Amino acid sequence: MQQAPAALAVALALTATACGAAGERAADRPAGTPSGTVRSPAALPSAALPPALTPGQARAALITAADLGEAWEPTRGAATWRDEVLKTASEGTARDGCRRLLDALYTEDLFGGSAAAAPRATAALDDTDTGAQLHYRITSYRAADLDRTLAWLATLPDTCGHVGTRAAGTAREVRVTALTPPETGDARVGLRVTVRDTAATEDGTLTVDVIAVRIGDDALSLTHGTLGTPSGTATRTATETGTARLTEARRQGRAQV
């Protein structure tokens, strides 16, 4: 009976030694160096993901038709050019990066299709005066992965600046240029994508402005498209108002933790 405390002390000492050795091995690795097998984001355990906004918090951060003006209202359905132009242009594009972009515009899914990166909230609005349509999404994911998508988008004016497509007997010209977004959030990128029917006798050019902004581990993305030129005022208002609301939703979310 007198030996039990001593045995317990030895066991505790051995445990402390093992923990200390593990800590030293971890300290020996450079910061940011992964240990073990590197897995895809979808394979990582949920504990590795940052805390996401609740659905209610994400919905509260959405923009509304009232933010953009009297001509705007909740959408009544997908615009006709979504299938007639975007989908067929994507099907006729051989260049991988360009097709990926057109697919992302068609599905409104800029940040990937994994369940972990699924949008937390979405909104779709129509401009009844011009026929423009604005789709808006809020996504929660790892900041590094969000930045990876932003970096890819930023390369597209160079890698997919001008490409021809042909599908369903129609030849189209796709152009991707940089668009300067408002100075909001932690990181941001903007693009203007135009798709033109090369045989059209009248102006039938589809123009889609794309904005993506990261704020911490959350991001907002919007596409603003029309057969013509999207309103720069509406795009800017949606971006700035949305960023302010998302920032406030994040602040309130942290305060409730």
Regions inferred by a protein language model and the residue ranges of each:
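N-terminal export and membrane-targeting signals
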Residues: 1-10
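N-terminal low-complexity, Pro/Thr-rich disordered segments
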Residues: 7, 14-61, 92-93, 248-257
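N-terminal leader/capping segments at the start of a protein or of a new domain
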Residues: 47-91
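Second-shell loop/turn segments in exported
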Residues: 52-54, 134-141, 225-232
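Extracytoplasmic/secreted envelope proteins and their assembly/folding machinery
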Residues: 59-65, 69, 147-154, 236-239, ...
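Sec/Tat-exported extracytoplasmic proteins
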Residues: 66-72, 76, 157-164, 242, ...
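A small/polar (G/S/T-enriched), proline-flanked helix-loop surface module common
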Residues: 75-202
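A short, solvent-exposed beta-edge/loop patch
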Residues: 175-240
